[in-house]
Amino acid sequence: MSLKSVLFFASLALGHVIQPRSFSCQSPQLTQEQIDIAEEMSIKEKSMRKSGMTIQATISVDVWLHAISASESGLSSDSALQNQFDTLQKTFSPYNINLNYAGKTKTVNAQWANEGNGQEMPMKKALRRGNYQSMNVYIVDVLPTASGYCYYPTNAPEGSDNFYIDGCTLAKSAMGLIAAHEAGHWLGLAHTFDGNNCDGPGDYVDDTPAQSGPSSGCPASRDSCPNHPGTDPIHNYMDYTSPDCWTEFTPGQIDRVNSQWNRYRA
């Protein structure tokens, strides 16, 4: 998105991820159609909760990791890829979102390794695996303006551009919990501060407190909307706080993930 944080580049050592303390996300803004659908989902979810019903069920996701680099030596190691999957799995398993490591690919291609070269679609058409329920994560050398991004779920018949463009892209230096933030978008979640307006709908999820804009670092008790209930959700994976500050999705966010999954990916 247009909102940017400072990216402190990390490195990989012995296959272990060293996590940047802040980042920038380039996931696209919600379209008007996606906003309208989010509003519809919010109404339905609220009605179900009032009736004592739950929309939540077990979701199973095959995960494909694709390492792309300009050189053989620049490719992410098998252990780094395994660590990345393990981080995703650990993040989502408490919410009945079960991830399966379906496989990996490794590709040396200087054009694809730099996202600034405009080769996203050719790369994804060549590398994508699985169906629309499969999360494909592309790990590249360079993302010129961001740490990562994912596409929101949408109508995507197999073989269509929407089908191929789907997935998540990460700079290799941003591997780790940042992938969990981006995967939240792939599952249908917006930023908690979406709209940057205390009085707006925000992320269209009822139980994430109002937030005037993105947080950074890990600012205890930050309250950017003091006239609204709750303090800013600094521990939420969908804020811009430091990844080591993240610990949670809300029940309402998991309702939304299920609504999005049932509509687009089930």
Cite the ranges covered by each PLM segment:
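A short, polar/charged loop/turn motif at coil->beta-strand junctions and beta-hairpin connectors
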Residues: 57-59, 131, 162-164, 232-234
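Sequence contexts marking disulfide-bonded cysteines in secreted/extracellular proteins
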Residues: 24-28, 149-151, 167-169, 199, ...
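Metzincin-family zinc-dependent endopeptidase catalytic domain
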Residues: 83-216
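Fungal secretory targeting signals
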Residues: 1-20
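Short, histidine-centered active-site or binding-site loop motifs used for metal coordination
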Residues: 65-69, 174, 241-242
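Metalloprotease/metallohydrolase-associated module, dominated by Zn2+-dependent proteases
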Residues: 158-160, 205-266
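Propeptide-to-catalytic entry region of secreted or membrane-anchored zinc metalloproteases
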Residues: 16-135, 139-143, 262-265
